């Protein structure tokens, strides 16, 4: 009886060894034509990189790729050879990183991307490698940040961006990758900050700029070539707006703590019931310069200066004001910088 058991054990061991040898021989096999056949495993420095099946050199079924620590990095399901492949990638903690399909090695259909905490970060849609359909981006907290629509790899239709917690930031419209139609930007609280029209990527018509309270502060008028033609400022007098052509304004002068006087180039004056700091926020500071803490001048009205000492200058203004205007410190340096050739003749 013992001899019989020994013979059976010996036969079992032999079978196991033969089976192992056959399995080893079946791994990473190349046929006489040099084509990969059957199960394959690739190792680098003793670490498994991927494993899968080949049939006539073409991947078939499930392929798995691995991180150096042995965890699954991605799984590819070869549905019809390499012409259609469903792919899922993973973070090292095991959570899904992305999911989607390749058709002829190009992204197709919906793709989704996730954080390592399993939060959806983006949704994308493709047609044979080209962006086609809705694209949505999310914050790591899961809030929507951006929505865009593509057709044939170009932006088309309505696009939106958001502040945190999905408050609207911008709404714009595209045709074939160019801005066309209305664009609106918002302050937090869904208050419009500016709005206007685009045509073929260029601003056109009247654009409105508002303050955080929703009050209109400035308008800009553009021609069909996107060139600005007119700018208007809105001064508030006891809560009511008064529209002024910016080209007619020479100076803004502080009057007490709560008022500002706009002095026009023809000498007329308009008194606003808002302080200078509030009005200055809406000036085009490429066209106005701070002469003193209490006075802003339109650039063309600053005709020159006379040095008083290293830290101060007397500013020459046209139309002239009723008093000498002395710029000091940073304001004096700024006035000097307007005249690169040095002190001009009065």
Predicted segment positions?
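Glycine/tyrosine- and acidic-biased, solvent-exposed loop/turn segments at the edges of beta-strands
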Residues: 22-231
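Basic, polyanion-interacting recognition surfaces, primarily
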Residues: 227-346
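Bacterial Sec-dependent N-terminal signal peptides
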Residues: 1-27
